[in-house]
């Protein structure tokens, strides 16, 4: 099975924010050089989620979507699933799975502590 990973961010009109996200995805690609990894934005920037899904579907039969969102709010609970449902209808043979947001992962507490130390 040809698997791809799509990392999704909210999106921003500000180019520096878009570039920051792209750099993060690039670093993740470096960590996993054999994996097919792409990025997309929910809104305000490109590629959009549908654009990225279409591109990945050309060579991948399974797409794992990782939302780079902190909590399970409306975007993760409703908006992204709606986009994935529309894609599945258009590509019935495609296997698309949506991962969980970052959530209350204990590692986030360590990051908060680190940020606090930098302020002290």
Regions found by a protein language model. Give the residues of each.
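Active-site-proximal alpha-helix that buttresses catalytic centers in soluble enzyme cores
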Residues: 1-120
């Amino acid at each position: 099975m040809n698997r791809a990973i799509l990392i999704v961010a909210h999106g921003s009109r500000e180019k520096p924010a878009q570039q920051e996200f792209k750099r993060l995805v690039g670093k993740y690609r470096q960590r996993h050089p054999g994996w097919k990894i792409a990025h997309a934005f929910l809104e305000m920037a490109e590629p959009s989620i549908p654009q990225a899904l279409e591109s990945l579907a050309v060579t991948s039969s399974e797409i794992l979507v990782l939302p780079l969102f902190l909590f399970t709010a409306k975007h993760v609970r409703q908006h992204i699933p709606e986009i994935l449902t529309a894609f599945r209808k258009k590509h019935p043979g495609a296997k698309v799975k949506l991962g969980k947001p970052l959530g209350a992962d204990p590692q986030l507490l360590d990051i908060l502590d680190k940020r606090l130390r930098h302020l002290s």
